[in-house]
Amino acid sequence: MSRQSTLYSFFPKSPALSDANKASARASREGGRAAAAPGASPSPGGDAAWSEAGPGPRPLARSASPPKAKNLNGGLRRSVAPAAPTSCDFSPGDLVWAKMEGYPWWPCLVYNHPFDGTFIREKGKSVRVHVQFFDDSPTRGWVSKRLLKPYTGSKSKEAQKGGHFYSAKPEILRAMQRADEALNKDKIKRLELAVCDEPSEPEEEEEMEVGTTYVTDKSEEDNEIESEEEVQPKTQGSRRSSRQIKKRRVISDSESDIGGSDVEFKPDTKEEGSSDEISSGVGDSESEGLNSPVKVARKRKRMVTGNGSLKRKSSRKETPSATKQATSISSETKNTLRAFSAPQNSESQAHVSGGGDDSSRPTVWYHETLEWLKEEKRRDEHRRRPDHPDFDASTLYVPEDFLNSCTPGMRKWWQIKSQNFDLVICYKVGKFYELYHMDALIGVSELGLVFMKGNWAHSGFPEIAFGRYSDSLVQKGYKVARVEQTETPEMMEARCRKMAHISKYDRVVRREICRIITKGTQTYSVLEGDPSENYSKYLLSLKEKEEDSSGHTRAYGVCFVDTSLGKFFIGQFSDDRHCSRFRTLVAHYPPVQVLFEKGNLSKETKTILKSSLSCSLQEGLIPGSQFWDASKTLRTLLEEEYFREKLSDGIGVMLPQVLKGMTSESDSIGLTPGEKSELALSALGGCVFYLKKCLIDQELLSMANFEEYIPLDSDTVSTTRSGAIFTKAYQRMVLDAVTLNNLEIFLNGTNGSTEGTLLERVDTCHTPFGKRLLKQWLCAPLCNHYAINDRLDAIEDLMVVPDKISEVVELLKKLPDLERLLSKIHNVGSPLKSQNHPDSRAIMYEETTYSKKKIIDFLSALEGFKVMCKIIGIMEEVADGFKSKILKQVISLQTKNPEGRFPDLTVELNRWDTAFDHEKARKTGLITPKAGFDSDYDQALADIRENEQSLLEYLEKQRNRIGCRTIVYWGIGRNRYQLEIPENFTTRNLPEEYELKSTKKGCKRYWTKTIEKKLANLINAEERRDVSLKDCMRRLFYNFDKNYKDWQSAVECIAVLDVLLCLANYSRGGDGPMCRPVILLPEDTPPFLELKGSRHPCITKTFFGDDFIPNDILIGCEEEEQENGKAYCVLVTGPNMGGKSTLMRQAGLLAVMAQMGCYVPAEVCRLTPIDRVFTRLGASDRIMSGESTFFVELSETASILMHATAHSLVLVDELGRGTATFDGTAIANAVVKELAETIKCRTLFSTHYHSLVEDYSQNVAVRLGHMACMVENECEDPSQETITFLYKFIKGACPKSYGFNAARLANLPEEVIQKGHRKAREFEKMNQSLRLFREVCLASERSTVDAEAVHKLLTLIKEL
């Protein structure tokens, strides 16, 4: 194999920089500030953070600086006059979308450079435009013209969900808001917004873009050289030549790390100046043996674009000096580095010198040539093929002979990949995360990364960018594993010295998986980044068991958790053959990931997972070993002592109360599951196993935050006495998945967004935790009329104090997501995680950055709770005049009001204010506790002071004893406190206890046993201080978390206040009349619904710009003056497109709003509580479930007939249209009869079957109503008719459906409409003939024929 293929050829020695050169290089690097990328100000990371961390990957292309542009050191730097601007589609003052590497599209303003006076730069074929990013702290930069698009507003199609520029991130939404404001101004006014005029790092603010070829990991020296080259107009050849002369290290074009990627990293403050100074794994002993001070470091390979469009530059030639240095590496070092050499094969040789163009890239990647990796030959770790029923797709069998041929670093990668084949492995090498083989392909295609050269697919990104890139992969459905280096080279050497036999694979630093991230297990730690939305995402674990052989009933055990909050829900329930309760659960708590026991799911459950949860990740776990049974779950929870800290004061079994209630009463140690809890505990076991696999079990379970899940309809089934359920405070209205979708409460049926939904219309909450609570209230409105009226009282109380509300709203806007911050603080402070979690051993290059983020989060939480206290203070001033009990509870302090729920946080907040220097900690990332806060730290400091004082006193005694006042202490580290005595005094008789340690001209240095003892005590105290300081942040967060209940209670109170303010805001600002719902108990009156002058809450204007027409909806109202006024079923007819479906949705939504405790858009709203809303609206099939349109209709109807009670509200739209006319009519007739006469629930039933209307026209249980329309020129020719929809719901039946009017509006050909009309007339005559024949037959059977029967026969004859 060629010498060039081995790694040590890329590690030539370089003489150490002199102090002067180091200072010069540092000044050159730190002389300016890199232009921040958009969004970098609130969250450090990404490309901008590379510059902050040190010299990292930068674009090769540099722009020429303007003449005599000032650098940050105040001097003038050499520059070249800029080239003449090229033509551009944009001009100063234009608003654009700009795209930068690793960031979403961002709204920007084009404006002239503050020093150049130009907004365009041209270099070769590249044209860049100068922009300012709309951000909380405006930043500027140069962006390629091809990555700019005109900005047309946040309401444009491309900025909405599904559009090219759509983003749900709060910072981008704020940026779009600022851009919208600028869009309404002219260009001159817009340019006044260009406020970012601070100088940036010497014109290196051109951010890295997609597809850019760049060299990574430049050292201090390289940066210094590049800054000089940047301002010198030289040719490519001369620049390369110049750089070669100045470089102290040689960058080889062959791959440096494909085969031997095990170059290690050890952070060292002494070598902090260079961003690529990473250890090679060579121990200190080896380094000391080198001829000169050498820094062995790995150069990142030159990256090439995925499409290979950029040409490879000619290879550099080594200078004689460089060659000489390279050959002087010791043989010992070479032998060590050979462990990382690339494999010897023809393909490696062929591509080792390949360039970045298409011709140099392999047509087939190396991993694609491996026979055992091909799909048809792949096996799992147990050598089972994919067609085996127990095949484990998450593992891979890797032949042992292949592993033996790998380099140590790549062998470790394959070992990790073989156990986690379904994960994208982010493999830490130095300060970069590397992606290899199939993972590299994903990185290039999904993240826009670029391939490194060679026949192995290989890409990567810096440590600081992990949060951004991993989140991008996770949101696209991938599972990501973060593999960290958990051992330094020194630790590796110490380990190897203890081993009897050492192989080359042992001389590799340890790496461990520190975290597996999936959609359902995101905790948003400092490494993972911030959440992009406020709502919860659930991980659901599911266990199913059929309760009878027929399969008509089944039982479910469920456990679902929001990992960002650490809150678990666990429950067990029976379900029907349609899985109604399970469907409701996944609608209320939509999971993004589902775990289930392999081979245990029924066909119906699989259908739900395949259809309703098709976008969720689904993973089957092996029964027993992965999906635990109930007994193993309980045993593991107790053995792992997850709840030790939270339940340390508890008595008996160390389990949370919810879990303790699921154990057998006869088992005092809590290892036996309860009779009706086995499935629930088994589901928890599957969840715990997966969290354990993802390495977040300790941080989540240790919160002991469990809540039992009980289906909302559990009481409605068991209650027999009419209306008894409405006296229970916890009873809720049931809204199943079908109803939530049909009423468009959360998502619309058009594009799946929140546009036009009830949630969007009502939601004006200002806090993330308030938004989550509002969604829960919408899922489950109240049924207890006392609770409903109490919320309505709260809304009225708030509406009468608008001044106070304005103050509170402004404070609410300042609150961070405290609920998630509490979970983060707990995770950082958890002693369980700090003891044995791999992350506690990980070697992190950006540790200071992460520490700063943790401190910022902590301080943000403290500030948030201070703001909460201010809010309570404002509300307490007016609380005495409030009627609402719930409002008084959430705004009253527990210490002042016995019914108050808000904890008094004043003492705790004051304590944390004085605990440490906040500003210093924010800047340094280190926490130094003040006296009195940390007893261990205080004791260590006291011991240090005591020992130091004791040593000073001892020195004074020795001076007096020897008679020399010039005796001083000398030494550093563990050799401190040597008595330095002038030589002329040492000739006298010194005490025998004096032990000579060292000498120098003119004096000698001594130790005594007393000094050694006192020094040992001092060193011990210093070590205790350092240990205490190192663990200070964790212990500080842990102490804060001890009061979790108080902090969480405060969050819950403010969440309720935020939602009440939201409802008050809607109630006060609705379009048109708003009224307070009147809720009456069923004991006082039969069930009824009265809506007068009601409007659809989500539609204020029609599409034609007309005002929405209010309507009266009366069902079962006593005051209605007609014979069938108490009818519970209303048949709704009317023309097509006349508004029937809208009317029915309107009734359902207003009922939901009324019982949620909100004002409704109506003049009058009176009702008895509704226990459940059923809907059968729209017509669609379920392809994924294999269900036809008609089957879907009947399934939803069957659920209604099975579960509806007299207190339900049923909305059925055109049942029976999915089958033959007579079949559909018959089914609709039977359903109406069942609903009206048997169940007697409030029903709106729309239909176009006019025979159905005739059948029930005289039925006292059914009332008729229709959507009015006005017909002009009504005649036999439908083309001459003009139909005007009045959208008014009135009494009686509509004579026709006017379907041909809809056909004409849909632009059907006129001849088709005419033919259809003639055919319709034939059908009508045939139907009338049949009716006449039936009446004649009935009349002939009667003994006498009355006048009414004769009149009916004559009428039918006349119609014919």
Curated annotation (Swiss-Prot):
Record annotation: effect of changing residue 728 to T: In LYNCH5; uncertain significance; no impairment of heterodimerization with MSH2; normal mismatch repair activity
Domain PWWP: 92-154
SMART domains per UniProt: MUTSac, MUTSd, PWWP
Protein name: DNA mismatch repair protein Msh6
Organism: Homo sapiens
Outcome of mutating residue 20 to V: In LYNCH5, CRC and ENDMC; likely benign; normal mismatch repair activity
Result for mutant: residue 449 to P: In CRC and ENDMC
Location(s) in or outside the cell: Nucleus; Chromosome
CC per GO annotation: chromatin; cytosol; Golgi apparatus; intracellular membrane-bounded organelle; MutSalpha complex; nucleoplasm; nucleus
Effect ascribed to mutating residue 901 to H: In CRC and ENDMC; uncertain significance
Lineage top rank: taxon: Eukaryota
Complex formation: Component of the DNA mismatch repair (MMR) complex composed at least of MSH2, MSH3, MSH6, PMS1 and MLH1. Heterodimer consisting of MSH2-MSH6 (MutS alpha). Forms a ternary complex with MutL alpha (MLH1-PMS1). Interacts with MCM9. Part of the BRCA1-associated genome surveillance complex (BASC), which contains BRCA1, MSH2, MSH6, MLH1, ATM, BLM, PMS2 and the RAD50-MRE11-NBS1 protein complex. This association could be a dynamic process changing throughout the cell cycle and within subnuclear domains. (Microbial infection) Interacts with herpes simplex virus 1 protein UL12.
Name of encoding gene: MSH6
Region (Disordered): 1-84, 195-362
Ranges of biased composition (kind: Acidic residues): 198-209, 219-230
UniProt similarity note: Belongs to the DNA mismatch repair MutS family.
